[in-house]
């Protein structure tokens, strides 16, 4: 039985000069937390990865000012994970998303799962 494709896009902020609680208070976005990591998931399930990345771009745009301030004190990355289609698959990072991530000094971490 073939598994359904899945995807996930998560904006992550690593506690550095700020605690995870301080990061959450500064960003005012409901998110998952651990001792060293604050993260917000753009969704998943049946959404296509391109749609998830558009959600991330909208989130970055909406909270840009606060994210820039936090990114000056903490490492930020975008964790992108998906099961690619058999053969060949692609991911599109649009210019707006790239510009916003660049402004934060954020890395993009790509994680794929294949059989």
Indicate where each model-derived feature is located.
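Acidic (Asp/Glu-rich) sequence patches and key acidic residues
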Residues: 1-115
């Amino acid at each position: 039985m073939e598994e359904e494709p899945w995807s996930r896009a998560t904006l992550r902020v690593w506690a550095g000069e700020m605690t995870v609680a301080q990061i959450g208070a500064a960003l005012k976005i409901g998110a998952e937390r651990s001792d060293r990591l604050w993260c917000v998931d753009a969704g998943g399930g049946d959404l296509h990865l391109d749609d998830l990345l558009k959600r991330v771009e909208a989130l970055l745009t909406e909270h840009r000012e606060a994210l820039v301030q936090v990114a000056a004190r903490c490492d930020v990355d975008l964790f992108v994970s998906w099961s690619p289609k058999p053969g060949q698959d692609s991911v599109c990072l649009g210019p707006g998303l790239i510009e916003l991530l660049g402004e934060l000094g954020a890395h993009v971490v790509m994680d794929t799962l294949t059989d």
